[in-house]
Amino acid sequence: MIGIIALLISILLPALGQARRAARMVRCQASMSQLGTAFYSYASDAKGWLAAFSWQPGDQHSQWPELNQSTNSTDAHCDQAADIVRRMTSRNQPRFDGRIMDRNFTHMVLADGGYIGSGKLPVEGVVCPEDRYPAIWAKTQPEDIEALVSSQQAPLDGSAEYRQMLPNWSSYQLVPAVWSSDQPDQTISQSQTDYRLYSHYGTTRFVNRRIDDFAFPSQKVVYFDLFDRHVSRRTSFYAYLTSAQPLVFADGSVRVKKTRDSNRGWDPLNPSSMSAATVYFYRVMQFDDPAPKSGTAFGDVVDGRYRWTRWGVRGVDFGGAEPVRRP
């Protein structure tokens, strides 16, 4: 009898684990669907304009004078993020600069407009159920984040003032094409050695897009996760051809897609070349990163894929070839 029970347990436990993982994927898809609906609803109410940080150098939008002094696009968006936190939480979020907020914090613009969440920060449902540490940050008071840094539960990135924003982190990134310029001398590009970061310069300008800027909305990704947390047996970087994950498309739909089925993408610094693509290294950069598939410290070379779509918002990620000229 004991042997039979042990056999049943050995059979049922893996199935139970798979069922729980499948349930977490359903929750993730529901969260992304909520994000896609909010993204589309915002555009409908804003006469076509997309939700993204919009402040520019020289703007005087904040009631706090220190948040009106930025001299570049990056810092203007930092000021806007700090302003949102102060207004929505009545907490004096310290000013910070030098961080590209458009990657993991753009949902705050939707929250500020009442399109997602319940009028409070942090917003529930913007962290993947499999993304362990941001879930911890969301439950941590901003002034206590440094204790998580010390215990290697939060990254030592940016200033202490910036790290107070981590409770508002989202697993789901808005692709650069939605908020960066198309002009090679004003756009951003991928850091070659750090998969997390973008390279930007003194001439970098961030822009605001419209919903009708998408030439192929059902084929263009807008929100993605840097990692496949649900489909592969082990968490893997999104750009590996074997990875797959739920993605939010510009038409508001959420679909699970395989990276190998996506187009290769482009190099935004060389947009006229049909052969140039964004190529960079994936390697372990922070405490919770999965190892590269090669198992080496050097890491693996990957393509940008739907993170760096050819022709930006005018391009195609899935279900068709890359246009040979800008649509």
Q: What feature does the model see in each segment?
A:
Residues 1-33:
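Amphipathic alpha-helical segments typified by the pilin-like N-terminal helix
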Residues 29, 34-327:
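Short, well-structured segments within or immediately adjacent to enzyme catalytic domains
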